[in-house]
Amino acid sequence: MLTKKSIFLAILFTLSMIMVACSSQEYTTAKLALQQSDWAKASEWLPKAMAVEPNNPEIPIVLGVEIYAKDSQWANMVNMFETAMGINPEKVIEVRGPFISVKDAVSNYTEFYWAQEFNIGVEQFKKIQEGPDNKPDYLETAIFHFINA
């Protein structure tokens, strides 16, 4: 038979584990905003979550991918990736489903967005032959995307 003391200790242990494993209210609010595609609210709460959880490398990755990359703010995205790498590159995090290390997430997203920008630049460059009248505009846009890549 379990004594009251052992039941109390088991409940106390369970509650303490739940509290340690939970994200902050700020990060939970930001994740909920992302699920609802409320980008303005997410961009408001993710920096707050970073302030409350400065040792959580998942938050800067999410901020970089879901807010900065979405808005083509590449310098800010890279800054967030560097922040996450500085916290703990080996920590396993969950971003958009799979659990991977911070260093793998940074590598994957950097490569993905580089390829995306490069391909947009190639498409703009190809348009020069299709519409020579707009050659300067297409060339300028292509150069812009190649620089971003």
Language model regions located:
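Canonical positions in the second alpha-helix
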Residues: 49, 83-84, 149
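Bacterial N-terminal signal peptides
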Residues: 10-18
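Short coil turns that delineate tetratricopeptide repeat
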Residues: 54-55, 89
